[in-house]
Amino acid sequence: MKMKKLVKSSVASSIALLLLSNTVDAAQHITPVSEKKVDDKITLYKTTATSDNDKLNISQILTFNFIKDKSYDKDTLVLKAAGNINSGYKKPNPKDYNYSQFYWGGKYNVSVSSESNDAVNVVDYAPKNQNEEFQVQQTLGYSYGGDINISNGLSGGLNGSKSFSETINYKQESYRTTIDRKTNHKSIGWGVEAHKIMNNGWGPYGRDSYDPTYGNELFLGGRQSSSNAGQNFLPTHQMPLLARGNFNPEFISVLSHKQNDTKKSKIKVTYQREMDRYTNQWNRLHWVGNNYKNQNTVTFTSTYEVDWQNHTVKLIGTDSKETNPGV
């Protein structure tokens, strides 16, 4: 009898610990829907959903803007994906002598996809093209009849004909934004990748840079440095912020829904980080640097049920993955 009680107690404790662990790793919150009558044709319904994974150090902040337009035969959802993706940067061991390494954030990926039938499609997004600017600033404007316009800058050149606008504003020093090649009417994806990094006036270098003698000098301290391997790297404070700190994404996707079709659909939002491993090694003549791409990848996905009739969203599940955990 005592053994049975002990087993029951142990199982209960394990379940409680598991629930607590899940709560800590993935916290969610959805704000009440706010309603705003923009003009005699358009009504805006807005709600914000947050979904965090503390273990992966990834946070999603999603703003759902439902646009009900009397002059348009479809429902429009302007979804802004923001939040935080940590680089996962891990400092090298300063005591390493002839060889050392560290991990850094080489690329960040964000995607939004419609998991439903043809009733819901991706009809526009921002940014729309490759962008290498230090700071990406764009404005999406909507006017009655389903007209969408995307312009550079935070004002976007909006005029009185625009009934609604949403902006994106993020920094990507030494990185560039690209559009996923798999982007189509059901899915849109962006990649923000290390592109042109300067090293004490030399460069620019990228993830794939290579010299037959010195390798990839992306973060190499010095070719003939007398320092230990663990101290012969570009100082941390000189590395781009996205390589060693956090990336704060801001992307917009526009989804269109046929009004007479299904009232509910699913939308999946995925944030991902690719970590590279950078190494240096003394070959008895000079130092050689190398960069190994995508040595650790973490992915955090949230799936939402969208109620087009009531203009609400509900988180129906999260999923997290990591390749080569513990590096």
Curated annotation (Swiss-Prot):
Gene3D superfamilies linked: Leukocidin/porin MspA (2.70.240.10)
Q: Which GO molecular-function terms appear in the entry?
A: toxin activity
Gene Ontology CC annotations of this record: extracellular region
Q: Does the keyword Nucleus apply?
A: no
Where is this protein localized, as stated in its record? Secreted
Primary subcellular site in the record, as a coarse category: secreted
Which key words tag this protein in UniProt? Cytolysis, Hemolysis, Secreted, Signal, Toxin, Virulence
Could you name the domain of life of the organism this protein comes from? Bacteria
Q: Does the keyword Ligase apply?
A: no
Self-association and partners: Toxicity requires sequential binding and synergistic association of a class S and a class F component which form heterooligomeric complexes. LukEv (class S) associates with LukDv (class F).
The role this protein plays is:
Part of a bi-component leucotoxin that acts by forming pores in the membrane of the target cells. The activity of LukEv-LukDv to rabbit leukocytes is similar to that of the Panton-Valentine leucocidin (PVL). LukEv-LukDv is hemolytic to rabbit red blood cells although the activity is only 8% of gamma-hemolysin.
Q: Which family does it belong to?
A: Belongs to the aerolysin family.
Protein known as: Leucotoxin LukDv
